[in-house]
Amino acid sequence: MSRISISEIYKDDIIVNTPITIFGWVRSRRSSKSGFSFITVYDGSCLNSVQVVADKTLSNYYKDILHLTIGCSVTITGILILSIGDKQKYEIKATKFQVLGWIKNPDTYPISAKKHSLEYLREVAHLRSRTNLIGVIVRIRHHIFQSLHKFLNKQGYYWIPTPIITGLNTEGTGEMFRVSTMDMRNIPKKINGSVDFKKDFFGKESFLTVSGQLNLEAYACSLSKVYTFGPTFRAENSNTSRHLAEFWMLEIESSFCNLDEILIFSEDMLKYICKSLLKYCINDIKFLKNYIDNDIINRLKKFLSVNFIRINYKDAIDILLNSKKKFDNVVSFGVDLNAEHERFLVEKHFKAPVVIINYPKELKAFYMRLNDDKKTVAAMDLLVPGIGELIGGSQREERISVLDLRLSELGLRKEDYWWYRDLRRYGTVHHSGFGMGFERLISYITGISNIRDIIPFPRTVKNADF
């Protein structure tokens, strides 16, 4: 007899009154004095549980079944029947019931029947996936991941596995994790006292990647449309609900594509994801509606129906200055927008997703294309309500002379970027791309405000447990 998942039962894939076998964990047990027990079992394949009816005719009824507690792992063989109760559509009349794993001490089991706060669940991250909420988040995360791959494949994009270890600083910042095999108690030094990285594993200073963009551009210049999707690392000392040291990033690069075209593409991609979730994950979405965000369905439907607002950075600054609102962070031209500025624009002023374009070059990375005014770059940040920046991208600088100038202005050695510069020397093309924080997208969709509740094992400042 084949193993059946609970999701298959609720998809009406299984014929009623046929024998089936399921595996799962106990969510609850009710037992009557007349010799019947009603055990709720889940297996994580969907939000639903299934009720199992076990009676005293089972050989291990008194020995095992009457001692079941939440969390016990079980396998049940029985007959799938239509439930006579109104709380569930199906139930299983058990003919064989086996306990695979007991909860050693139910009184100290961290995931008990009571409701737990998200803060508490972070402390038991290895067990929190056993709760309904985290299960919902994981299934939604999985569906978004699969939907992105499906969408990009339909659009003719190829997935490229970019390296996690790099010798380049893509963003030009110092917030990188260093990779080394050197003995920290006896670090080799040069005569001048600096670290001799030639003695290290890679023979040079190396880091965990902050972005796969530069490598991705190399393949965009031959395959036209490419993307990468994987973990990214930032040693940013920010202990907030919006920051992780390790997170997942989707990065897109498209040759023969300008800023306007990549903007349209990003909007189409996000709307495809939301539409797919409302179609295929509606039960999980409804759970979030009941427990996290009462407006989630209307919010996602509105997201599908509105056009994204597009404004210049200068106009965004003018709106903020004219709002007369007192911000914690000063607003002026040439200052990077803070989260409070971004959220004011999308939540108070426009009440819709906003794309800000054409930032001052001083605020952006060396690889962004310099505009004709020589003061701004063809950059874009896509902002959404509740989150702020979701996507950051630009048209890339394809002119080697301008690229070299920007590297020099930012104090970066062009020799370190020799292969990246080669892309401009040999058959250069105009191209554009963007990066999207995967956890931020999930946060926006689910309404879960703390990003640490969205990734299975969060890595943050002073925290690398589990």
Curated annotation (Swiss-Prot):
Catalytic activity: tRNA(Asn) + L-asparagine + ATP = L-asparaginyl-tRNA(Asn) + AMP + diphosphate + H(+)
This protein's UniProt keywords: Aminoacyl-tRNA synthetase, ATP-binding, Cytoplasm, Ligase, Nucleotide-binding, Protein biosynthesis
Tagged with keyword Flavoprotein: no
Pfam families, A to Z: tRNA-synt_2 (PF00152), tRNA_anti-codon (PF01336)
EC number annotated for this UniProt entry: 6.1.1.22
InterPro entries for the chain: Aa-tRNA-synt_II (IPR004364), aa-tRNA-synth_II (IPR006195), aa-tRNA-synth_II/BPL/LPL (IPR045864), Asn-tRNA-ligase (IPR004522), Asp/Asn-tRNA-synth_IIb (IPR002312), NA-bd_OB-fold (IPR012340), NA-bd_OB_tRNA (IPR004365)
GO biological process, alphabetically ordered: asparaginyl-tRNA aminoacylation
A single Gene Ontology CC term: cytoplasm
Keyword Ribosomal protein: no
Subcellular locations according to the entry: Cytoplasm
An MF annotation (GO) of this entry: asparagine-tRNA ligase activity
Family per similarity comment: Belongs to the class-II aminoacyl-tRNA synthetase family.
Description of how the protein assembles with itself and partners: Homodimer.
HAMAP family xref list: Asn_tRNA_synth
Protein name per its UniProtKB record: Asparagine--tRNA ligase
Gene: asnS
